[in-house]
């Protein structure tokens, strides 16, 4: 599969070589550029094939052909089952955004080799005769529902991942948590955003569980492992920053929306637990309580977390794209019971 990228040279790039522009402005690798320059019309400037050493001027139009390498082709087992039909939120020639249901993994892992969201996307590409690798940009936990973004080519993947790391690409989540924020007058405001900066590490007693280190206060973010304490091994800590806003709070449970500056494993679940508000249905981070003590809480048979919104720039035309994943039935039922709407 071939992909043509068109780029207009900007004024500050005048005097640079074609190769430098392709590498700095488009983020292409030397291998991608080398592969293109040996094709007929693989790299063109103003409609004419050019050399990578040619000098560019303002408003020159550069077109490069990116050919999929062998390892770019789809290699996953295609899964086309009806249990979780693929819900597409957005698609063009470079990206695909889908609404992941709770209960399936984003990508094959362990015993789940053919029944994941990526396998479904693979089957969808196969059905449409699109030969490209399945590239999820970030992942959601198995029990988390919501938006998952896929890149259809390597350049899109590189650029979207760079946006994710720089914070240009960001998601907003909805969660239902235990307990009330009403005792905390600052956190109970439905207009204010609050920040949690507890560092996170793996626990020693469970292969999947993470924990937040609260010994230094919520504003602590480790800069290095040079600081030593007898209680905490600093080399195991990962900085983690979560922003949250309380949308609704009752005596037994609350609704919050969250944004992340970092993407650590289980970050939202761990930070909410550290605040004393573990997510409903989260059996990994919440102790089991007697049934009668949960009578005022909604019943969730999975972790009550939904990746609600995403915003990013298109990897090629740079326009902003904002998407929203419809709430799943368990969230809708919960909100309807209290006449709450987003």
Where are these regions (language model features)?
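RNA pseudouridine synthases
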Residues: 1-342
């Amino acid at each position: 599969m071939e992909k043509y990228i068109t780029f207009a040279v900007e004024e500050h790039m005048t005097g640079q070589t074609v190769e430098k522009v392709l590498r700095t402005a488009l983020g292409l690798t030397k291998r991608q550029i080398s592969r293109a320059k040996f094709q007929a019309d693989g790299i063109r400037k103003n409609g004419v094939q050019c050399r990578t050493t040619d000098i560019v001027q303002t408003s020159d139009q550069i077109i490069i052909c990116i050919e999929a390498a062998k390892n770019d082709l789809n290699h996953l087992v295609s899964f086309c089952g009806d249990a979780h039909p693929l819900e597409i939120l957005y698609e063009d020639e470079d990206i695909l955004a889908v609404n992941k249901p709770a209960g399936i993994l984003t990508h094959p892992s362990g015993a789940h080799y053919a029944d994941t969201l990526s396998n479904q996307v693979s089957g969808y590409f196969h059905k449409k005769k699109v030969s490209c690798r399945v590239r999820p940009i970030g992942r959601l936990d198995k029990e988390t529902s919501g938006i998952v973004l896929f890149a259809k080519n390597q350049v899109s993947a590189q650029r979207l991942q760079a946006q994710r790391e720089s914070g240009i690409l960001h998601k907003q989540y909805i969660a239902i948590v235990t307990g009330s924020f009403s005792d905390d007058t600052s956190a109970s405001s439905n207009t204010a955003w609050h920040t949690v900066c507890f560092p996170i590490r793996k626990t020693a007693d469970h292969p999947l569980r993470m924990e937040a280190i609260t010994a230094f206060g919520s504003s602590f973010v480790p800069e290095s492992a040079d600081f030593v304490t007898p209680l905490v091994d600093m080399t195991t800590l990962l900085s983690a920053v979560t922003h949250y806003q309380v949308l609704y709070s009752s005596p037994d449970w609350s609704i919050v929306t969250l944004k992340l500056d970092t993407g650590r494993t289980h970050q939202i679940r761990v930070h909410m637990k550290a605040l004393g508000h573990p997510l409903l249905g989260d059996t990994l981070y919440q102790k089991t309580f007697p049934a009668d003590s949960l009578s005022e809480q909604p019943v969730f048979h999975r972790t009550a977390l939904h990746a609600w919104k995403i915003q990013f720039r298109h990897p090629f035309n740079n326009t902003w794209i904002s998407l929203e994943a419809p709430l799943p039935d368990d969230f809708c039922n919960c909100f309807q019971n209290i006449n709450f709407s987003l």
